[in-house]
Amino acid sequence: MNKKEHILIVGAGLCGSLLALRMAQRGFKITLVEKRPDLRKSDISAGRSINLAFSNRGIKGISLVGLTKKTEPLCIPMNGRMIHDKTGETFFSPYSGNKSEYINSISRTDLNALLLNEVEKLPNAEIIFQQDCKDVDLKSAKAVFEHFETKKKTELSGDILIGTDGAGSVVRQSMEADSDMNFRVSEYFLEHGYKELSIPAGKTEKYRIFKNALHIWPRGENMLIALPNLDGSFTVTLFMSYKKGEQNFEQLKSEKSIKAYFEEFYPDALEQMPDLIKDFSQNPTSPLGTVKCSPWNVQGKSLLMGDSAHAIVPFYGQGMNASFEDVVVFDEVLDDFEGNWQQIFDEYEKRRKKDTDAIGDLAIDNFHEMKEHTAAPVFQQKRKLETAFEQEFPDEFASKYRLVTFREQIGYNQAMQRGRAQDKAILKLLENNELSDSLGLKEKLEKVNQATKKMLDGTFS
């Protein structure tokens, strides 16, 4: 493989920027093309999530490019979920019994800007903004772009082309339109959408609610969440059905209806949201979708990566982390198979596909768990037990969440299989009152491990 080879990357979001940086560090010539303006110079959020959950799998990607120290000041640790009930009472549920394991809230814009700055420092990389991809020649790694303002068309090419252009990927649509490919794609959208709102920084206390947690207001069919920002504000997201159910976005059209809804379901949050009506009226309602597709490449010339290959809903906080892990896996495959792009692309998909399918499924599972079950007594009982196991026996037990979020050395698929079996085992044992207080914690763990093994073997009844 000639390190002078030219890689054309379509999409300069988080995945594309990290990929461009790593490939440039490896010596490839990089052209990174983005349809939006430079986010370092203008606000282009357009309803996209302002901050993101950043955890071990994503940190692995940042470590690969040597940016761990530069990323740390951008992070706010979140040690667990703070559950808010309708009366304003709270219940803190740690993410792990191990206090050194936590997730971070990080600004999408700050992290993306850091990556773009690092790409620009390298002489073998260039970034071109405001170029909207209109057409892709997948078999020759060429693409036609149209300037956002002038509408002038430009053709760019590389030795290979990688599409990191997000859930609505033009590169993926080109694969879907190619009748020679036998391309398969599924797009599944929830009946729910989301709307970004805010809790501003306080005047006396900087943070109006507890800083180091992901706040959740679970309300059955709908829910509110909040993540902290460095300036003391919180990014609040309302997840709600578009039209179905007793409460939905369609019903919340007037100032009166919006306020009445929040007074009934989120009274303690409403007290901290002076800009609710303005935010609700001005910010878009955005869809929540999962994309799965295959194959990810065309003849060793074009490849999909990140959300363009496997968009997921945000309920495991793994979208960015999964995309960053894509770059890590791709980098490992390059080490193993350098010299043949077809072999590299095929091997990359072989190693990655089952894991990205798994996190897509897990994210939908977690959506239902967060909005419906986090407030349920049996769920809280289960979490207390899991936390106790992790505190006392950290090497012998890991909850599903811990397997997915903090055990980055195992794949999402393995984490899902083990975690689902373990969840079913614990809930079944609790329902049958087989984990009574008369048992010691070690005995309870042995029962859980035995039941989990039977679940995995298909012999648990």
Residue ranges and their predicted role:
Residues 2-13:
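Beta1/beta-strand and adjacent pyrophosphate-binding region of the FAD-binding site
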Residues 7-9, 30, 302:
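Conserved hydrophobic helix-helix packing surfaces used for dimerization/oligomerization
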Residues 12-25, 162-163, 197, 284-375, ...:
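Conserved mid-domain beta->alpha element of the FAD-binding
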Residues 15, 38, 168:
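Conserved Rossmann-like nucleotide-cofactor binding loop
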Residues 24-47:
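Glycine-rich FAD pyrophosphate-binding loop
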Residues 42-118:
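Active-site-adjacent segment of FAD-dependent monooxygenases/related oxidoreductases
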Residues 117, 122, 131-135, 140-288, ...:
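Conserved FAD-binding catalytic core of PHBH/FMO-like flavoproteins
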Residues 332-461:
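C-terminal helical "tail/cap" subdomain of flavin- and related membrane-associated enzymes
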